[in-house]
Amino acid sequence: ALGVMVKQDLEDLGMKVNFKPVEFNSLVNKMTNTNDWDMAIMGLTGTPLEPHDGKNVWTSNGSLHLFNQRPNGYTIDDRLDWEKELDEIFREGALKLTYEERKPLYDKYQTIIYNQKPIIYLYSPIRITAIRKKFKNIFPTSLSGLIYNLDEVYIN
């Protein structure tokens, strides 16, 4: 349904779209092995509690690094400057132990992603959340869900 809606929206803007749904494993194979695709709709998941979980998407050699892909034979030396910076941030982030050391790094990575926009997020699902009154300092968001600030939640 989402693909049909995106196709219609793009056609309304004057673009010609050949929408062809494919089985998930075939899609992943095309995107990661053959580079035989122009545009894809895919859901990426992760936890808002650990920013390093995004390493497989945001580092230039990550298994789901689906933008600025390089044909076989190209080396990592042809990375864009901001991709090199992301690689370094994730390398450094893995070596830091404290929140105070890690937060500036992952804040910077989010700023780079915001500025470069290598992926366009189309939507966030509607969620219905129920919270018992005894839990305090919980503020669900449409993007981060319920537990983005788990370290600040308490029971009264």
Regions found by a protein language model. Give the residues of each.
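Bilobed "Venus flytrap"/periplasmic-binding protein-like clamshell domains
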Residues: 1-8
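Solvent-exposed, acidic/flexible segments
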Residues: 3, 21-24, 75-87, 95, ...
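A local structural motif
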Residues: 8-22, 85, 92
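Hydrophobic alpha-helix feature that most strongly marks membrane-spanning transmembrane helices
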Residues: 11, 15, 32, 45, ...
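Periplasmic binding protein-like
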Residues: 13-68
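Short, solvent-exposed loop/beta-turn-alpha elements that line the ligand-binding surface or hinge
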Residues: 30-35, 56-91, 124-156
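Bilobed periplasmic-binding protein-like "clamshell/Venus-flytrap" ligand-binding domains
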Residues: 39-43, 94-133
